[in-house]
């Protein structure tokens, strides 16, 4: 099994899909944290996306909505980690679900930790 490592820094807050962050030592685990958002596709977007789906190709309205939703879920994840006293998040994952065929739920979750830079 290969472990994929991705690290982003949103406002200098280390976030990784791996269970550790290179260059940092985990000194305390704060626990499970998440960020959630639910977005409506809107009638106009549904109609244009429906028409576009007839001819195939990327549905740009949905791509934009999903990118915005992912960013919002990630920001909420960071806020939750800060609330529990974390300064980084490891083991980050995303999940998405349809709700009633008109809304999209995006969940970002992981483990809040306290890290310090290794010397």
How would you name each of these model-derived features?
Residues 33, 38, 46-93:
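Short, well-ordered alpha-helical segments
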Residues 7-45, 83-84, 104-119:
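N-terminal presequence-like segments and the immediate start of the first folded domain
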Residues 1-6:
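Short, Lys/Arg-enriched N-terminal segments with co-localized hydrophobic residues
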Residues 18-21, 94-99:
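Short, solvent-exposed loop/turn elements at beta->coil junctions and helix N-caps
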């Amino acid at each position: 099994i290969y472990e994929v490592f991705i690290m982003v820094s949103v406002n200098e807050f280390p976030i990784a899909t791996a269970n550790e962050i290179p260059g940092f030592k985990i000194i305390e685990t704060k626990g499970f944290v998440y960020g959630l958002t639910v977005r409506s596709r809107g009638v106009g977007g549904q109609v244009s996306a429906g028409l576009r789906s007839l001819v195939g190709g990327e549905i740009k309205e949905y791509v934009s909505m999903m990118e915005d939703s992912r960013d919002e879920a990630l920001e909420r994840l960071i806020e939750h980690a800060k609330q529990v006293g974390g300064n980084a998040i490891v083991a980050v994952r995303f999940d998405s679900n349809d709700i009633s065929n008109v809304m999209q739920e995006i969940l970002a979750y992981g483990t809040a930790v306290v890290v310090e830079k290794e010397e």
